[in-house]
């Protein structure tokens, strides 16, 4: 089985990535953040859910010899992440678009299909609670 993980997020993630960068700014009560394009959308999946799904996949006979996306099937924009963090921390942060963070060939939307994952496991992949995952970080 080949597992194609999408954007795994959660406790212990490298602070150089966008989600922990956002969380740390809110935790530190910073008033502004310099970012690139906040309208790009990515398929995030919780690290704990990822571990459970991998455990299930390695024992699922239907997954043998398959290439399977490890994803949630739903895209979330950076703007959406910021909105949820503003709800969690109770304040609005000023977003400054910084050209050094804007990618020339940005992929606007990157979302995986859960169809094969669900087929291999014989069950529906639970939807991630973005509020809960960000709160735990």
Name the predicted role of every residue range:
Residues 1, 24-28:
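Active-site Tyr-X1-5-Lys
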Residues 1-11, 32:
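Conserved beta-loop-beta element that borders a ligand/cofactor-binding pocket
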Residues 7-10, 24, 40:
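Active-site micro-motifs of SAM-dependent methyltransferase domains
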Residues 11-17:
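Short beta-loop-alpha junction of Rossmann-like oxidoreductase domains
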Residues 18-19, 44:
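Long, contiguous hydrophobic alpha-helical segments, chiefly transmembrane helices and signal peptides
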Residues 27-137:
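C-terminal substrate-binding subdomain of Rossmann-fold SDR/epimerase-dehydratase oxidoreductases
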């Amino acid at each position: 089985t080949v597992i194609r993980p999408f954007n795994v997020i959660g406790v212990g993630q490298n602070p150089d990535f966008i989600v922990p960068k956002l969380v740390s700014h809110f935790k530190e009560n910073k008033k502004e953040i310099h970012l690139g394009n906040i309208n790009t959308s990515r398929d995030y999946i919780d690290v704990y859910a990822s571990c459970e799904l991998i455990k299930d996949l390695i024992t699922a006979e239907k997954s043998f010899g398959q290439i399977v996306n490890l994803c949630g099937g739903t895209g979330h924009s950076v703007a959406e992440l910021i909105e949820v963090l503003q709800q969690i921390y109770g304040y609005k942060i000023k977003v400054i678009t910084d050209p050094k963070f804007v990618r020339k060939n940005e992929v606007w939307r990157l979302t995986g299909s859960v169809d094969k994952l669900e087929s291999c496991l014989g069950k529906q992949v639970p939807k991630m609670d973005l509020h809960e995952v960000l709160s735990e970080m």
